[in-house]
Amino acid sequence: MWALLHLRTLVAMAIALVALFVGGVVLQAAGEAKAQSTGKQMTTASGLKIEDTQVGTGETPKTGQTCVMHYTGWLYENGAKGEKFDSSVDRGDPFEFPIGTGRVIKGWDEGVASMKVGGKRTLIIPAELGYGARGAGGVIPPNATLIFEVELLGLK
């Protein structure tokens, strides 16, 4: 009797683990599909707003890989683009950074991590995922929301 009860418990635990794993995979796939929907804005749990303008067809970056990007950044004021503060496109010089290592603002690490090479995306980054209360170099004021148009050109 005890052996049968023990066996039932093990089987129930195995079923629960499989359901948890499958459910997690389904939820992850649904989240990725939602993030990849062209023209539809999504907001992540952190408050980052993402809108794909062109879904890429290449690889998705892995932590530590170098992302080769073009970008243009503006202040985001009253629901619209404000003053442009930087652009690799204008310079004709792509920007490179290792993803997921904290070398860029949090909004970039989060917003670029699910892109595919060839993709273009708009990121609306709240201050806490950008430069926060300190701002940046007299160009970005304290507590500024930022908007970036980014393009993942390649991975190294």
Residue ranges and their predicted role:
Residues 2-156:
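Cross-family detector of peptidyl-prolyl cis-trans isomerase
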